[in-house]
């Protein structure tokens, strides 16, 4: 059985709309160059909750909570061509999206 090449792309962002648009761009680019695409697969959202005291001096009972949600997507590109890799490197994505690529 031949060892097939695969590119795994993990996307992270705080805004899910920008994340979905970026994932759609990547999938469209990969399909246009002739590669098979699996995804985007939505991964569980991380939620960080920060509790701070509202008053600067006392009144510890009065607190405020803030949360930060990190949305994640996973895309697998199966059988990528050299044209696929080249076009993915040139792809222009928004600055709010963290991209992790594993070959």
UniProtKB/Swiss-Prot annotation:
A molecular-function term among this protein's GO annotations: tRNA binding
One Gene Ontology term, aspect cellular component: ribonucleoprotein complex
Keyword match Ribosomal protein: yes
Taxonomy, superkingdom: Bacteria
GO biological process, one term: translation
Entry-linked PROSITE patterns: RIBOSOMAL_S10 (PS00361)
S-S bridge residues: none
Keywords of the record: Ribonucleoprotein, Ribosomal protein
SUPFAM superfamilies named among the record's database cross-references: Ribosomal protein S10
HAMAP family (UniProt xref): Ribosomal_uS10 (MF_00508)
Subunit and partners: Part of the 30S ribosomal subunit.
Job description of the protein: Involved in the binding of tRNA to the ribosomes.
Entry-linked NCBIfam families: PRK00596.1, rpsJ_bact
Classification via PANTHER family: 30S RIBOSOMAL PROTEIN S10 FAMILY MEMBER
Family designation: Belongs to the universal ribosomal protein uS10 family.
Protein name: Small ribosomal subunit protein uS10
Lineage, top ranks: Bacteria, Bacillati, Bacillota, Clostridia, Natranaerobiales
